[in-house]
Every structure is written in structure tokens, then in C-alpha cells.
Amino acid sequence: MNRQKITWLQILQGWSMLLVVIGHVTLTGIFENPQTPVSATIERVIYSFHMPLFMFISGFLFYFTKISRDLAYKEVVFDKLKRLGIPYLFFTFFTFAVKFIFSPFMKRPVELSLRQFTDSFLYPSSNPLSEMWFVATLFIIMLSYPLLKYMITGHFKIAVLIIGSVVLNLFFPPDIFLLCLSNVAYMFLFFCLGILFCKFDIQRFLSHSGSLLLSLLLFIALNLIPDCPILLLNLTGIIFSVSLCLNLTPIVSGLFSSFRDYTFQIFLLGIFPQIAIRILYSKIPQNELSYWSLYIISILLGIYLPVFIAKIVEKIPNKLIRCCFGL
């Protein structure tokens, strides 16, 4: 993978993380609040594709860093336990402590019990840091490394993989919360698409301005259709995002460079200052000025406070501490 391809992917990572942070603002604590129609529309559009985009990027990187190098299964599992498992464990403990101390201010307070702690792993969506469902889902999908490596070795097997992934996405029961199995089934398709994009360099077809315009118009049109199938929104959002970042790379190659190398740390830490901003908003006079001022502050803090913390942690010589923060 040449430098330009790496750059577009870095921009895509920054873009996806920006979407996540904006999607987590929710100052009123009510998702898609009709009292704030502009931000509600922003939330609706972002949530139509941002997590599938994250999974697509993860699949792309998984092929580039693991599958293409034909790493041993135990090496892949050990690496992901270190990179995903340790932060999961650390931030589960950390969030339990924070939510217990500040329980009067929490929308989802916790109780310090063995049952709730165990459920945080068996049912990741119940984790005190709700975003951990994605980490658990990603880890479980990555455990299928031998299957994925085998299924992309021939055209027929690739066709079976795609069809099977679509079937899982559309028809797997949506309410199986044990080990995030419903999320695993839904997100598996986008992870596989990321793998295939990297393997076959499919993104080269999206690097032209015509592709960007067409994907943008299609994405807008589908978002304007009431009750549009969510899978179509997922896919068009991914295609538009990839094309956008490919087209931006020759123009602004340093876009998002101030935070795009710390996307996992932002994902883990960004929600905490954003929750603090929500609490602050609930305590002050609420008007357009205070809303949009804190909206912007929430985005900036959600991005740059984790970056600041990550840069400090990077300088700590203790490897375990760095691993706790995904570094």
C-alpha cells in the first residue's frame, strides 16, 4: 500500500471519528430531540452509517495488517487481546468507578455488584461504557480470522461470503444481546467489505470527482426517502465517505492530522468530557447561544482532551499503562 493510499485511509479514520464525536453530543440527553431539529437531523444522518463505516475501516486494516501477512492465528488473537481486551477491561473498571461516584448525574447509574460486572462482558451493550459494544463486536468478528482468510481465496468462496454476510445482516434476530451476537451478525458484512476493498483495491474506482458527486447525490436522495432500508443508507454512507476522503487527499493531505492517529483513544475517552458538557447544559439557562456554544465545545473537548491524555500516556514508560489506553 503506497503512501497516498495510507493518507486517504488516515483521513477516513479522522472523518469517521469526527462523526462519532458529533453523534455523541446530544446535549439534551434525548436522541433526535424534536425540540432541536437541526442537531436531530445531524444525528439521524450520522447514525445511518457511522458505525458500519468504522467496521469497514477495521476490516480494511485487518486485511492490510494481518491477513495479507498470513499471520498465525494465535498471534492475531494475542495481539487483539492486548489491543482490545486490555482497554475493554480497564475502561469497564474505570467507568464503573466514575458512574458510581457521580451516580446522581448519570443517565445510566451502576451498582457495584458481581452480576453487573459479569454482565458487562457477557452482554457488552450493558457495559457502563455503552460504546464498548463495538469493541466486543469487533473482537468477536476478528476471531473468525481463519474463516475469513479461507473465504477470500477464490471467486466462488467470496460470493458465498458476501451472500452469507448479507443474509446475516438482514435476517439474524436483532435481540440476541449475549456476546453482542446480533451486532456481530449485522456488522460482519461491513467488516468483510473492508477486507475485500483492501484485497482488490476497489477504492480506486471511487477516487474521481464524478464518483464523489454521484455517491453524494445518492446518499442525500436515500436519506430523504422515508423509511429507506437502513442497509442502503449504511452502504451509500460508506461509499460516499471513501470517495470523499480519496478526493480530499491530493488537496488537503494533512486533514484531521491533529487527531487522526488517536481515533481509538478518542473513542474510549471522548464520551467523558461530553457527558460533563451535557450536565453543564442542564444547569444553565438554555437558549440558542448556549446550545450551539456548548455543542461546539463538546465536539472540541470530545476530540482534543483524549488526544492530550494520549500524548501524556505515550510518554509513560510502563507498557501495561499504555496498553490500557490502547497505545
Name each model feature, range by range.
Residues M1-L327:
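Alpha-helical transmembrane segments and their immediate juxtamembrane cytosolic regions
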